[in-house]
């Protein structure tokens, strides 16, 4: 009975630290990754996105691992889905004034 109590008192602080680590770091990061993945899967033609390089582009076509994007009126490119930072909403679109 004494050994069991010693093991519990030894492992309890480690368990508490693990739970704190999980709820403060791991869980929020997983939720953010899930939200980002859903955003990428929901992108359609005409959506404006910002790449991780800072370019603002318009989605022309969604493929399995890439997007065909329009950089300007006469330039198109393919962008890996891994490099999409976020989607521009109407409220966050920068003004050209």
Swiss-Prot record:
Q: Which SMART domains match?
A: YajC
Q: Has the keyword Transmembrane helix been applied to this entry?
A: yes
Chain segments annotated as transmembrane: 6-26
Pfam families (UniProt xref): YajC
Q: Which GO terms describe its biological process?
A: protein transport
**Subcellular location as annotated:** Cell inner membrane
Q: Organism's domain of life? A: Bacteria
Answer yes or no on keyword Iron-sulfur. Answer: no
Annotated Gene Ontology cellular components are:
plasma membrane
Membrane topology per the entry is: Single-pass membrane protein
Q: How does it assemble?
A: Part of the SecDF-YidC-YajC translocase complex. The SecDF-YidC-YajC translocase forms a supercomplex with SecYEG, called the holo-translocon (HTL).
PANTHER family, A to Z: SEC TRANSLOCON ACCESSORY COMPLEX SUBUNIT YAJC
Functional note: The SecYEG-SecDF-YajC-YidC holo-translocon (HTL) protein secretase/insertase is a supercomplex required for protein secretion, insertion of proteins into membranes, and assembly of membrane protein complexes. While the SecYEG complex is essential for assembly of a number of proteins and complexes, the SecDF-YajC-YidC subcomplex facilitates these functions.
Q: Which family does it belong to?
A: Belongs to the YajC family.
Q: What is this protein called?
A: Sec translocon accessory complex subunit YajC
| Species lineage | Bacteria, Pseudomonadati, Campylobacterota, Epsilonproteobacteria, Campylobacterales
């Amino acid at each position: 009975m004494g050994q069991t109590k010693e093991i519990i008192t030894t492992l309890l602080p480690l368990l508490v630290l693990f739970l704190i680590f999980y709820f403060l770091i791991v869980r929020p990061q997983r939720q953010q990754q899930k939200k980002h993945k859903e955003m990428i899967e929901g992108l359609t033609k005409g959506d404006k996105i910002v790449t991780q390089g800072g370019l603002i582009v318009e989605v022309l076509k969604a493929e399995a691992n890439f997007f065909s994007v329009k950089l300007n009126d006469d330039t198109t490119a393919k962008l890996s889905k891994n490099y999409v930072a976020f989607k521009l909403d109407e409220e966050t679109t920068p003004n050209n004034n």
